[in-house]
Amino acid sequence: MKKNFFLNGLFATAMVGLTLTACSDDEQGNGAGTVGKGEYVIAASVTASGNTTNVLLTSETLNGGTVSTINNGLVNDGATQWVFYKDQYLYGLTYNQGNAGTTRSYFMNANYEVQARSGEYAVKRFTTYGIYDKYIITSSTGDGPTEYADENGYLPKMFLLSYLDVAAETYTTNNTQNKAYMSENFLGNGEFVTLAGILEHNNKIYSAAVPMGLSQYGGKANGGQWILPGNEDLVKTEDGGSNSSSYKKGELQWTQYPNECWVAIFDDETLTTKKLIKTEQISYACGRMKSQYYQTIWSADNGDIYVFSPSYAKTMSDA
C-alpha cells in the first residue's frame, strides 16, 4: 500500500511546480488548515528575510490546505529538473551554465520523510533526459575529441551522455572516441542534431532528433556541399550571439529543414544503433526553454507513440 501511495504522490508532484511560504501552526490556508505529512512530495522554495531555501516537503494531500515547513521537509540545494524513478527514488538534476552540475537522489522513509541517499555526482551538461531500464540518462550535443578535427581544426559534434545507475548509485559516461556517437550528418542532410526526450517503449528508446543546422565542421564538409542553394548568406561571417543562441564564424545556425520531423529509435541505452522515421506533416518535435529541449514524444496506454510539434516551420524565416 505504501508503495502505491508513493508512486501516485510522485507522479502527481511531477505535474506541478509549487513555491510555498512557511507558515505557523495556527495559520489557515485555503480554508483547510495545515495538512500533515504524507505520500506526496513537493519541491518548494521558502523565502524569509530575503534568503531563499530549497526544501523537499511531504503532504497527505494536494487538494487543499497549507503545507508547513515546521517539523517537515529536507533542505537541499535545489535542482533544474526533478526526475522520479518509478516508485522508489527522486533525482535532482542540476544544469550548471554549461558545466557539470551536482546531482543526487532521495527516498521516502516509513514516516513520510524525505532522506538523501549517499551518492553525489557531477553529471555532464545536459539538454534532455529520461529513464531507460535501470538508468536515468541525460544527453546533450557538444564538441567531439580533437582526434576527429578536420583540416581547419573544426571539431565534429557528438552526443554527450551520462548514465545514472539507480540501484547501484553509480555514474558513467559514453566514450566519444566511438564514431557511433557522431551527431554530424545524423539525418543524411549534413546537419548535426540534438536529442529531445528519452522514452522507453518495448525495450527500445524513442527520441526526437532535432536538426540544429550546420556546425563549422558540417559547413566545411566536402567544400560546403550541405549548404542549400540560396542559403549561402545564412552562413555566419563572424562570432556572435550569447548563451544558448551564440554562434561561431562558419556556422549555418538553425536548420534548413524546419518542415521535417525525425524520430530516432535506438536499440538500447548505448544509443549506437538506430532506425530513423521521418514525416513532413509536422516540424521537429521538442519544447524549448533556453538550452533545454523538452520531450514531446509520449506513449499511450494502448502502446501507440504520439509525437507533438510546436510547428516551428510556420515561425521560421531566412532573416
Predicted feature residues:
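Acidic/polar, low-complexity intrinsically disordered N-terminal segments immediately downstream
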Residues: 25-186, 195-210
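Long, well-ordered mid-to-C-terminal structural blocks that present hydrophobic/aromatic surfaces
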Residues: 301-319
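Secondary-structure boundary elements
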Residues: 167-170, 198-206, 214, 264-277, ...
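Bacterial Sec-dependent N-terminal signal peptides
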Residues: 1-8, 12-42
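Extracellular structured ligand-interaction cores
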Residues: 258-263, 292-294, 302
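Surface-exposed loop and turn segments in beta-propeller and other repeat-based domains
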Residues: 174-191, 270-292, 319
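Beta-propeller blade signature
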Residues: 57-59, 104-107, 153-169, 221-271, ...
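Short, solvent-exposed beta-strand-terminating loops
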Residues: 207-229
